[in-house]
Amino acid sequence: MGVLLREALRSMCVNNQWSYAVFWKIGCQNSSLLIWEECYNETESSSNPRRLCGLGVDTQGNEKVQLLTNRMMLNNRIILVGEGLVGRAAFTGHHQWILANSFNRDVHPPEVINEMLLQFSAGIQTVAVFPVVPHGVVQLGSSLPIMENLGFVNDVKGLILQLGCVPGALLSENYRTYEPAADFIGVPVSRIIPSQGHKILQSSAFVAETSKQHFNSTGSSDHQMVEESPCNLVDEHEGGWQSTTGFLTAGEVAVPSNPDAWLNQNFSCMSNVDAAEQQQIPCEDISSKRSLGSDDLFDMLGLDDKNKGCDNSWGVSQMRTEVLTRELSDFRIIQEMDPEFGSSGYELSGTDHLLDAVVSGACSSTKQISDETSESCKTTLTKVSNSSVTTPSHSSPQGSQLFEKKHGQPLGPSSVYGSQISSWVEQAHSLKREGSPRMVNKNETAKPANNRKRLKPGENPRPRPKDRQMIQDRVKELREIIPNGAKCSIDALLERTIKHMLFLQNVSKHSDKLKQTGESKIMKEDGGGATWAFEVGSKSMVCPIVVEDINPPRIFQVEMLCEQRGFFLEIADWIRSLGLTILKGVIETRVDKIWARFTVEASRDVTRMEIFMQLVNILEQTMKCGGNSKTILDGIKATMPLPVTGGCSM
């Protein structure tokens, strides 16, 4: 397919005074790379001495252009997007048009300046770079100053975009695969791609007329001979012919692989034309004589030769046989690499029925076909059907599936035959993965034995998991250790466990301080020492609240009389509400009275009088209100303690 790209570059140079044309292709694997794909320079078009003399081509300038393109290819065969003139154009998406007489070095980076100096030293006066997303970049150079033409820029981009619709058209000849080049030998790019009316396409030896004819995306056409732009000179034929206005000649662009057979087959009506005496033959005469026979296989399958773009010239049967031969050889290589591919359990039953239908239709058809053409078609399809290509019968029940349309464009002969093997291979692999019968284990198909033992009432058929059993055992142990945790829920049990652990942590923390606590001084002295009257005029002269200092600092001993109310736990809550930590709490009986004694620790510097006044306030409100202790505590917390710096003798 590289002939199409090369023909497009040649058309740009020859008809628009460009000295060279280069197509940089965006890398398929890495889009940040631009790869030198194809190049054309005017040295190739001026190899004929007669043409050099007639056109006045400067051979020395052509040699400089040739050396320039060779140096460009050797130095920068692969460039990064964003580097250099071509890379910057691909990155920005804007074309660049640089003239030697107006080149400004201040607006370009050093790498671009070096490139332009190299171009100018080779005699190039104009350099143009056109990015064509997503295919690549076109670079043009001319030894003449050419003014910027936006119409030409758009036409070049449109030409490359249309070439991109042809599979493999933007690949050079070095990267061609099994696609036969004979399908496009002698066919200029204007026959493959619709004309845009610009000079770039009108310059081809074969110019496609802007008519209702549609060309397919695979690059094959029906090769209808069309008119060319006016030309008064008839040059010598180099494997082709030149034409005058309204009459046909074959182009000088590309020479078929077998020129003699091609000319005898398609232009036998011109065998008597003398080279010195050119005859003008209308297009319709030649197109009526050039065909040796129609392709009845395509006719029977509903594809018209003229409308679908199938080619009948150049020995269609032979070329298609070569295509299928290459496809089948590729398939055999795949089959050798994957032995399971040919034995996946599917046969070509659908294709065999298709072949029978085609052959029977050919016998009953009203068209007369040559034995040679039908035999070649039958042999070709027989080779395909007898191969071990795996496809289900429902995948191709009718022949119309062989000629599906892509994007609304009919498929040409190369894609019809060339891509069918690939589609069969893909279908077979997908069906092998999805639709092939799954190997079922015998143990899966066997019915489970009905030998379960009947369980007794209350038995659990499945044992409890080991981790769950261990959790249940630990919860049971916690219920035995934590006070009042026998009948609470698991979350309440965990909460009690946390509180119990904090309590034990405080006990271990203050264990040394508990050893230093002493007894009450009131009980040691006769008469009880100084006391505080709870109520004036009461019979009891014993103070119900006593607060003493105990070494070390911030350790106090609080004693409260709780005989009448029995508020031991409430007293403990009151003490905690004052921000004190209870280190020890006991209930003692003294002279027929019950006392609650607490050893507490303060977290800040407080006096015993401050603690005493708070406890008196709490006790007074309790006796007066006789209400809930929690409500009383909430009210006490709202009152700030009075700072007392002096001591109180007990």
UniProtKB/Swiss-Prot annotation:
Described function: Transcription activator that regulates root development; promotes the production of stele cells in roots. Coordinately controls the number of all vascular cell types by regulating the size of the pool of cells from which they arise.
Domain bHLH: 455-504
Annotated spans, Disordered: 381-417, 431-470
Molecular-function GO terms, alphabetical: DNA binding; DNA-binding transcription factor activity; protein homodimerization activity
GO biological process: maintenance of root meristem identity; positive regulation of DNA-templated transcription; regulation of DNA-templated transcription; root development; stele development; xylem development
Organism, as annotated: Arabidopsis thaliana (Mouse-ear cress)
Keyword list, A-Z: Activator, Developmental protein, DNA-binding, Nucleus, Transcription, Transcription regulation
Name of the protein this chain belongs to: Transcription factor LHW
Biased composition (Basic and acidic residues): 456-470
Species lineage: Eukaryota, Viridiplantae, Streptophyta, Embryophyta, Tracheophyta
